[in-house]
Amino acid sequence: MEGKEEDVRLGANKFSERQPIGTAAQGAADDKDYKEPPPAPLFEPGELKSWSFYRAGIAEFVATFLFLYITILTVMGVSKSTSKCATVGIQGIAWSFGGMIFALVYCTAGISGGHINPAVTFGLFLARKLSLTRALFYIIMQCLGAVCGAGVVKGFQQGLYMGNGGGANVVAPGYTKGDGLGAEIVGTFILVYTVFSATDAKRNARDSHVPILAPLPIGFAVFLVHLATIPITGTGINPARSLGAAIIYNRDHAWNDHWIFWVGPFIGAALAAIYHQVIIRAIPFKSRS
């Protein structure tokens, strides 16, 4: 980093890519002038000496802490009611997850990239948008934040927390493990593909409004996936969220199918990264000058 702090832009791409406002009307000229940024190095030792590196990790910790705190608290509020009409219901839970992602991505995008999810970090790493060093640091901080967030909820209302499943992800009765795995793969694919599309460097260079609006489609994707898959798995699509709730709840059934909420999201994230980079952007097929 050579003594300089560099904020990580949305999508964890620190390389400058913006073109002057107004170039969208130039059409094909944009494609000719635009150059792909170089991939992030696998290891970047200089990051470990930069305050911006640790600041980004702290931002991921705090964001994931707040995410788990609000969302698990919402789940507990719905679970304790005997009547669905007296609570916000599944729609309210979905809104709490999607709304928090919208708010937290907006707040942390300029600091850490606003990942708040190991699957998002993994997908961006596969696309070489950030180094392995940063990816591992983010995932550790996300998991720690999730554990702390779920722990605070349990501390507030332990009886309710332990009596209503603690917000832990499990495959619902009537569904197989394959159903749960498939729901997690597809749900995470939708989320990570939305992240790639909303933070695409080429679109950002062409359309100045894209970076500003990016948190909105990401949060909305989380909302829609939760609406669809809460009845199946409680919706993971975020290994840190699943791990934090499972550790604090710590009952056998929370761990029985826990692997699904790591394997599924990581497969979904990998497929989204491959689809965007290879099919949509065709980066491997572009001539290198």
Swiss-Prot record:
Residue numbers covered by motif NPA 2: 238-240
Entry-linked PROSITE patterns: MIP
Motif position, NPA 1: 117-119
Gene Ontology cellular component list: cytosol; endoplasmic reticulum; plasma membrane; protein-containing complex
Region ranges (Disordered): 1-36
Family: Belongs to the MIP/aquaporin (TC 1.A.8) family. PIP (TC 1.A.8.11) subfamily.
Name of the protein: Aquaporin PIP1-2
Organism this protein belongs to: Zea mays (Maize)
Classification of source organism: Eukaryota, Viridiplantae, Streptophyta, Embryophyta, Tracheophyta
Name of encoding gene: PIP1-2
